[in-house]
Amino acid sequence: MSREKILAAVAKNKPDLTPLPEIQNFGNPYANLVEQFKAVLTAIGGEVVYVKDWEEIRAYIQTHFGGRRIVTNIDPLADVAQESWIKSDPHSLEDVGLAILKGQFGVAENGSIWVTETEMGQRVTPFIAETLALVIQKSELVPKMHDAYIRIGGERYGFGAFIAGPSKTADIEQSLVLGAHGPKSMLAFLME
């Protein structure tokens, strides 16, 4: 069969488009979204830090990450970053000790934070840094992934990811390795 015949047969057999099913909202099963988010993220190797404002984040970073290469695209934290990096070659980010990015919202069910390429600066940023810090408002937590999908369903973005905890992998001997495919540690700054 020629290529043209195959393509014509495929085009002729194309099913009608059907709309996506409605996503049902199952409500909030958690008594406290913040505590649920913290419990899950902590259980999977992340850390939650409660802060009131950008100044508290700045102080935390200076205390815990002084001397490391830091990148951020969050304007109120620009003074803790060491250089402009957003338009740099992504390979130049290989030695980043801490990347601080803003997340759009968090999911209490699995301790994840939704981040799009707009917040990432470069797509590689949340995956190449030794430590990833994501900043979200406490009020921006949703209970379940169903709620998260409802929230992102109408958005326009080229790339986005739900990021939950540090990178983890285990081999056949069940030896857990953190940081094999991404950051060794992850912080979530939950801001008032």
Task: Annotate each PLM feature.
Residues 1-192:
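The feature marks the mature, well-folded catalytic cores of soluble enzymes
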